[in-house]
UniProtKB/Swiss-Prot annotation:
NAD(+) binds at residues 30-34, 79-80, 106, 129, 163, 301. NCBIfam families: dnlj, PRK07956.1. This is DNA ligase. HAMAP family: DNA_ligase_A. It comes from Campylobacter concisus (strain 13826).
Length: 647
């Protein structure tokens, strides 16, 4: 994976995570998310100095939905590390010397995590996981769930955590009722449960027959030694019990996993794996946490489910860069509770690689999403009705002639609706100008109503124009206009990123802003290629982009007035040093990298004889080995903090 591919993968994962956690409308299967997530993780482990501040590997869950108030957990609500094979399980057991410990194994239910706070025996608050520190206060909705006790016999302060799910049968009945009312069916039980829990109207939640299954605790002073004892205590308070709860040794884990997997379909609720956690609570605390996961527990995920269906047609989608992406239209098939009608085909080279044709029978896999992946083509089932999938010559949106670059087929018309809308959505996104409220649906509506036709038009939106739109109230209009106004004066690097020049991501934009400031548009090919990390392709892309769009960029810049942050170097023992960061630290690496650079240090991604020292955290890998081999000084965080004070 290249740096550019990594940055794109981070953007994709964040979009998928937002759709999954915040909107309860997944854009990708669990398998696709997991695969891309682990590719990103592998890149970060190999390139720790390049980790994005927005990387999903450093974040737990999602955000807070508009309409709900924020509430904080007393104890942080962590995410879980996923593993997919016995080899990965063995590696996890060896980390921290867990092999001789006793474990608890239980189902990983596929729903929405919820934290229940009881005080003096009364349910006082119910909070979604959110980002792990704060979530949504859904207390009123939780009180409508029959399996959530309103009061318990224990009078101490305690956080009881679990999964909100919906039984498969109840999910089918719910969709039947929605069909009778002319409403669209819900995609799968997981999203039905999450969406039901986060309804603004508690009466809707009450009708959904949700189920709360506890799996742990947060704040508590029970004084118990084992997780199994804690869960017995919780279930004795009147909470739901599951019949699969095993206390096991290492050698028994595989058999337990296979047993649970074999019973997957017979379970009344959706499962997507088996949770394995150290039983001894004191040992759990000794093992500790990474920035995202507890080290004492892991989710051994089930394999994705595969089914056979037929590819009826291929639809074409156009992105903001003009790339035309083929999407397979399928004979509808139900996979593990979700009705699937489409599958990604990635690009036209992938179609040729698969050798797939219209009307072919294909194998698809998914896990928790409606857009699966095609894994195979059953060519032996062809009956003569198959048709070749032609590479398109004209844009399906604007009709202009397409440029065929091999892997990618592109629309070059800068006025193409798909490109314009996509570019505005990108510009307004969190990593760019961060214009809250200017998402996909709103941008499409504004474009259709003729209120915007380019990025600059965002800043010409008027109160009266927005008030005339369906669904827009005074508060919503003011919030949007305030967010647009607040985007003025944004950092130059964010502004450059928001313009969407091909091959110029966040890192390259920061380099341009810090090197050239407001004169970045005038940088020559020689100046660009002299920058660290800038290649010929990036330089040519930027020069071509600047030449074609100069007038529009300058006009937009006059409105936004992007700011250039001047970094003042603080002289201390770190000034002029070349530093490599490796391993897991107590703070995000981007934060430490920025701090080092403010001291005048250079942060490198690889260890060499020119490296002055390596800052090593937990589980440091090959870079630490290389440092020891070359005799490079290795320091920990406490030594780093001391060096900061040496002027």
């Amino acid at each position: 994976m290249t740096k550019q591919e990594y940055e794109k993968a981070v953007d994709t994962l964040n979009a998928w995570a937002k759709a999954y956690y915040d909107e309860d409308e997944p854009l990708a299967s669990d398998e696709e998310y997991d695969a891309l997530y682990h590719a990103v993780l592998a890149f970060e482990q190999a390139n720790p100095s390049e980790i994005s501040l927005f990387s999903p590997t450093k974040r737990v869950g999602g955000g807070v939905k508009e309409g709900f108030s924020k509430a904080s957990h007393i104890k942080r609500m962590w995410s879980m590390e996923d593993i997919f094979s016995l080899g990965e399980l063995d590696a996890w057991l060896k980390r921290g010397e867990k092999e001789n410990l006793t474990f608890v194994a239980e189902p990983k239910f596929d729903g929405a995590s919820l934290n229940l706070l009881y005080e003096n025996g009364v349910l006082v608050r119910a909070i979604t996981r959110g980002d792990g520190v704060t979530g949504e206060d859904v207390t009123q909705n939780a009180r409508t769930i029959s399996s959530v006790p309103k009061s318990i016999s224990y009078k101490g302060l305690i956080e009881i955590r679990g999964e909100v799910v919906i039984r498969k049968d109840d999910f089918e009945l719910l969709n039947m009722e929605r069909a009778k009312e002319g409403e669209a069916p819900l995609s799968n039980p997981r999203n039905a449960a999450a969406g039901s829990l986060r309804q603004l109207d508690s009466a809707v939640t009450a009708k959904r027959k949700l189920l709360f299954i506890p799996w742990g605790v947060g704040e508590q002073s029970l004084g118990l030694k084992d997780h199994s004892e804690v869960m017995k205590f919780v279930r004795d308070l009147g909470f739901e019990r599951d019949d699969f709860f095993k206390i096991l040794k290492k050698d028994e884990l595989e058999a337990a996993y296979n047993e649970l997997l074999a019973n997957r379909d017979s379970k009344s609720v959706m499962m997507d794996g088996m949770v394995i956690r150290v039983n001894d609570l004191a040992r759990c605390e000794q093992l500790g946490y990474t920035v995202k996961f507890p080290k004492f527990m892991v989710a051994f995920k089930f394999p994705a489910i595969e089914k056979v269906t037929r590819l009826k047609d291929v639809a074409l989608q156009v992105g903001r860069s003009g790339v035309v992406t083929p999407v397979g239209v399928l004979d509808e098939v139900n996979i593990d509770g979700a009705n699937v009608k489409s599958a990604t085909l990635h690009n036209f080279d992938e179609i040729e690689r698969l050798g797939v044709m219209k009307n072919d029978y294909i194998g698809i896999i998914r896990s928790g999403d409606v857009i699966p992946k095609i894994t195979k083509v059953f060519k032996d089932r062809r009956d003569g009705s198959e048709q070749a999938i032609e590479r398109p010559k004209f844009c399906p949106v604007c009709g202009s002639h397409l440029l065929d670059e091999g892997v990618f087929v592109k629309c070059q018309n800068l006025s193409c609706r798909a490109r314009v809308v996509g570019s505005i959505i990108h510009y307004a996104s969190k990593k760019c100008l961060n214009i809250d409220g200017l998402g996909d649906a709103i941008v499409n509506l504004l474009f259709d109503k003729g209120l915007i036709a380019c990025i600059k038009d965002i800043y010409g939106l008027k109160f009266d124009d927005l008030m005339s739109l369906e669904g827009f109230k005074e508060k919503k209009v003011n919030n949007l206009l305030n967010a647009i106004e607040a985007s003025k004066g944004a950092e130059l690097s964010r502004f450059i990123t928001g313009l969407g020049c091909e091959h110029i991501g966040e890192v390259a934009a920061k380099k341009l802003a810090s090197s050239f400031g407001l004169d970045w548009l005038d940088a020559s090919f020689e100046e660009l290629t002299a920058l660290e990390g800038f290649g010929v392709e990036m330089a040519n892309s930027l020069i071509d982009f600047a030449e074609v769009n100069r007038d529009e960029i300058l006009a937009l810049s006059q409105i936004v007035q992007p700011s250039v942050t001047q970094v003042q170097s603080i002289s201390n023992a770190l000034s002029g040093k070349t530093v490599v960061i490796t391993g897991t630290l107590s703070r995000p690496r981007d934060e430490i990298k920025a701090e080092l650079e403010s001291f005048g240090a250079k942060v490198s991604g690889s260890v060499s004889k020119k490296t002055d020292f390596v800052l090593a955290g937990e589980e440091a890998g090959s870079k630490l080995d290389k440092a020891n081999e070359l005799g490079v000084l290795v320091i920990d965080e406490s030594e780093y903090e001391r060096l900061k004070l040496e002027v």
